[in-house]
From Swiss-Prot:
This is Inner membrane protein YgbE. Pfam families: DUF3561. Keywords: Cell inner membrane, Cell membrane, Membrane, Transmembrane, Transmembrane helix. It comes from Escherichia coli (strain K12). GO terms for cellular component: plasma membrane. Residues 44-52, 107 are periplasmic. It is a multi-pass membrane protein. Coiled coil: none annotated. Residues 1-20, 76-86 are cytoplasmic.
Amino acid sequence: MRNSHNITLTNNDSLTEDEETTWSLPGAVVGFISWLFALAMPMLIYGSNTLFFFIYTWPFFLALMPVAVVVGIALHSLMDGKLRYSIVFTLVTVGIMFGALFMWLLG
């Protein structure tokens, strides 16, 4: 014999909980746009010679794109959906990651 009680559900009881707001799409867009801005910064600083540098190192910079998107999602959710703060912090964070990779590849 088991020592348990039967659980009865009535129509008043709901099994669904209140869903939290998701911030993945705006954060992903912010992360991708900040990756594009970070990709353009070496071209603005060093000019057209950067394209020859990117010919050999494009896989490294392409690998930063999903990282930038995840950083955008994470920072947007940490900022409780405040778009202005998440844009600023994502741009700074992705720019630092991009700059660190660029300086590491330059030697």
